[in-house]
Amino acid sequence: QRMAAEGHQIGTHSYDHAATGGGNGVDMTRQSPEKQIEEVQMGQQAIADATGSEASKVFRSPGGNFHGEIIWNLQPYITSEIGWNVDTEDWRRPGADAIAERLLSVKPGDVVLMHDGGGDRSQTIEALKIALPQLRAEGYKFVTIDQLLAYDDAKALAQELASQQAAE
C-alpha cells in the first residue's frame, strides 16, 4: 500500500515465480497458454488485493523469457512486456559495492533490473543508498515504465528530463 501511495508503478512478474517453469526454471514460455494467463491474472489480482488499486498492465516475465506464443496469449491482459538492459545481479548478493557499480553504469533511458523480494535484500538497499545520490547529482531522474514508454525513444526522455532539471 505504501508503494502505491508513493506513486510507484506496480505490475505483475507472475503469481508464482518459482513455479513458472514447471521444473524447467523460470520460463513461462514452457507453460500452457491457460497457465500463462492464470499467472498474470492471479498476479494482478494479488496486487489489487494488497494495494486497493488495479495493477499496472505492464508485465515482466520471470527470467526475461518472453517470446513466441506468449506474446499472443497475454495480449488481452497486458499493455506491454518490459525487459531490462542493466542487470545489477543483486539476486546473487555480490555485495553492495558491486551492485552499486553496476547501477552506476546506466545511461539515459536504461531499465535497471533489481529485486525487492526473495530473502535478505540488505545489499540491494545499501547499493541504492550509494548509487542514487550520485545518479541524482549527475542529473538522472527516475520515472515509471509507463512514463518511459510514453516517449518515442530514450533520447527524447533524456532531453526532456535534462530541460526539466535546468528549469528547476
Regions found by a protein language model. Name each.
Residues 1-117:
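Metal-dependent polysaccharide deacetylase catalytic core of the NodB/CE4 family, i.e.
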Residues 122-168:
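C-terminal domain-boundary segment and adjacent tail
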